[in-house]
Each structure stands twice: as structure tokens, then as C-alpha cells.
Amino acid sequence: MRPFGDFTDNLPCEIPADGIFLSAMTPTFTKLFEFAKSRYNPREVSPLIQAGEVSAAILTKSGNIYTGVCIDTASTLGMCAERNAIANMLTNGESKIDKLVCYMRDENGNDMAGSPCGACREYLMQLDADSGDIEILADLATGRTVRLRELIPDWWGERYMKAAKR
């Protein structure tokens, strides 16, 4: 199953219908941003569960895009958008991520890119020996990206991943 079809930088990058176009971002990150934004849908699922306040889109090394939304609960059983996107990816037999966008809105309702929380950073790092290379959109206005290893330096599991890679 190819959830959103093949995806490459060679695809044309058109101005979205709502007029938002961030020329500072690469066509790949622009498309990932639009996928993540399209999943943004904050709503109350029940008196104890809210969903969709953050959405995420990941691009795998094979060119597929998987998305997810956060699920916040009254207990500690919630799940971040990034981990839900990863669960969708793993469900479809993939495990290698190339790029990640976390979408949310600020207090004024403006679009913004978010950084994965500490739990998501850890989860991402444990996926693959090369996960430190995952490129993450850090700043929507400038299109600045960071590598996951910059967000979790001196990661404790590095030696285990290197040993398994041999």
C-alpha cells in the first residue's frame, strides 16, 4: 500500500488554494507541511479525550508520506502526532524516515512548525541507526531545518545502534 503515492522533489510545487506559500521552504517541505496541515482538526472526542491539536507528516526514505494527529487524554495515555504517524508507517511495513514536519497553530491561530517533544525524539532515534539524519522543519518563516541528532545530542543509545549496524 502506498498511502499517498510516490513523492519526490521533482514534483511541481504549486501555491496552495489558501494562498500560503513559503518560498523559503524546499518543495519537499512545502508538500509535507501541506499534508500535515490538512490533517489538523482539533476536536473533542469525549469529555476525557481531545484530538488533532498537532498533526505530523513524515516522508520515508522510499518516498511515502504518513500522517498522524495527537491524542490528548485525561490520563498519561495520550499519544503525540509524530508517534501516530510513525505507527502508520510501521503498519505499512516501513521504518526509515527522511523528513518530518510537525504542524500546529500559535495562540493567534497562525500556522507554525513545532519541534518533536523529548519522548518523540527518543522514539525517532530508536527506529534506525541513521535516524540522527532525519531532517525536521524547525522554522516555518525561514524554512530552517535541523537534523534529529541536533535535538538529541550525545544520545545514550548511539553505541547500541552502531554495534547492531556492523
Give residue spans per PLM region.
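Intrinsic-disorder-associated, low-complexity terminal segments enriched in Asp/Asn/His/Tyr and depleted
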Residues: 6-10
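C-terminal binding/interaction regions
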Residues: 26-46, 95-166
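Short beta-strand scaffold segments in enzyme catalytic cores
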Residues: 50-60
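Conserved mixed alpha/beta catalytic, RNA-binding, or beta-rich assembly cores of soluble enzyme
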Residues: 53, 69-76, 83-84
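Hydrophobic "anchor" residues
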Residues: 64-65
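Short, solvent-exposed cationic patches
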Residues: 81-102
